[in-house]
């Protein structure tokens, strides 16, 4: 792969690479931001990058990477700008690792880190490229850096993949890999976004995905222990899109096997064209906290992931490819 362009943000960089057959592929490297108390409020609402810089965690403490797994994406999610890019198939294991190598080569000053969280879903649905994605995760140990890798498998969990696997097959393979290879230190995140299955299907552009009920039943009844990292259900919070905490509890959401992540809807071209509006972001963060507290009443671990106001443009998947292609 060759370098095409880059976009700089206060906390890191978005890179646009190009495959040998000329397809644009995004990857990113970011530092995490402190989210404690008053600092969190200050960072969240600022348009001054200097304030962001003051609150960045060190590379030695935590580093955030993402790589793409497909040339575009087979799905047409209504909030994601990758949907507008023509789909050209899976990236090979080598092409995925070339992105990792590029990110490391671009940051030679980062030689060790207690946690390198690397997401395999910048562009593409990794469930459709499972063999190459897991192969790339396995090969992370070959890079000559003192890193504690924490790979992240982010998926909408299609009912049937293009490789012929069922959604349950994908869950089993990823969880077994998580436990056998990474001793539990792999983060499995499943995009949910609503507890209304019809609304979920609409948001995923008509994709046939496993229902939340099926996911909860499968994970709750998984025969082997799920250690170190529980399975995370991701919800992008949007106005008019229901997230029924009581319904999730009725399904048997088990705090020993599940966590929840609440994410504001980012400002994308697709979300604007489809009239999707975030329920909460940096300007009314208390609404996000109110939803979080409903989960916490049931002892469900909850993470809120809100970006700063000055970082919104250019951060989302597919946006750099649209600008320069």
Give the positions of each predicted feature.
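Short linear Ser/Thr-Pro motifs
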Residues: 6-8, 68-69, 155
